[in-house]
Design a protein with these regions (language model features):
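C-terminal regulatory or interaction extensions
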Residues: 1-241
Length: 241
């Protein structure tokens, strides 16, 4: 119920601003924890920011704008974030009954889709649903059955993102999450060979990026430190609605 919500906001603006306002709202009411490991800092966000960005773009682009009074809703709960927009699947099928890796791209609003493609907010090949899952599964604290879920009804499309740091008992202690992740890393260590296979990065490419001089190493360290502070900052311990 609306009266039970901690915060309720409505926006009327162009699509680019609506995307910004939506992301700001979600970031304000979700958390990104971290824990200091022996040799590094481990970030443990509730959600993948990029996956949620992809989801919000998907809902803004593919919603049915012929539905008068229709809106894109963002509902934030303790254990999940739900995005809802008017408009079911164009071919009349139910997305929950489909293999998302075999769903062809069908654009309800091609002009809007082209605009977002030009802004580099989406890809032309229509991989949004797959990308949301892949981005979530890459997080270190990902658990099975916590991948984004999609559902369609007669006139609506739903995307649900599950809080990776939450279970039936409430918020999972950050140390418990860190220990689980650390055990996984010990079982499946990341070495130079696996880094090359997955990311194309090795010691030579690192030297090429930052230089092999003390000044280059110091500069690279400084860049990494500033980037980390800018991206993660202090955790916001706010309530959600």
């Amino acid at each position: 119920y609306k009266d039970d919500a901690i915060s309720s906001v409505e926006h009327r603006a162009n699509l680019v601003l609506l995307l910004k306002y939506g992301m700001d709202f979600i970031k304000n009411y979700t958390m990104s924890g971290w824990v200091k490991m022996p040799n590094y800092r481990l970030n443990l966000p509730d959600y993948s920011d990029r996956a949620i960005f992809e989801g919000l773009v998907n809902h803004l682009i593919h919603r049915d704008y012929t539905v008068m009074g229709g809106e894109v809703h963002i509902d934030i709960y303790d254990d999940r974030v739900e995005l809802v927009s008017p408009g079911a699947m164009l071919d009349g099928t139910q997305i929950q009954d489909r293999d998302i890796y075999k769903v062809p791209s069908m654009r309800r609003n091609p002009v809007i889709a082209d605009m977002f493609t030009q802004l580099d907010y989406m890809e032309k090949r229509g991989s949004g649903l797959r990308k949301m899952r892949e981005l979530t599964e890459k997080l270190p604290n990902f658990l099975q059955r916590k991948e984004p879920q999609y559902q369609t009804e007669a006139t609506s499309f739903y995307t649900t993102f599950y809080n990776l740091n939450w279970n039936e008992s409430g918020r999972i202690p950050i140390e418990e999450v860190a220990n689980r992740v650390n055990s996984t890393l010990e079982k499946y260590p990341v070495n130079e060979k696996s880094s090359v296979e997955k990311f194309g990065v090795n010691s030579k490419s690192s030297v090429k990026t930052f230089g092999d001089t003390p000044e280059g190493s110091e500069k690279g360290s400084e860049i990494m430190q500033k980037g980390s502070e800018k991206k993660f900052g202090d955790s916001k311990n706010k309530s959600k609605s």
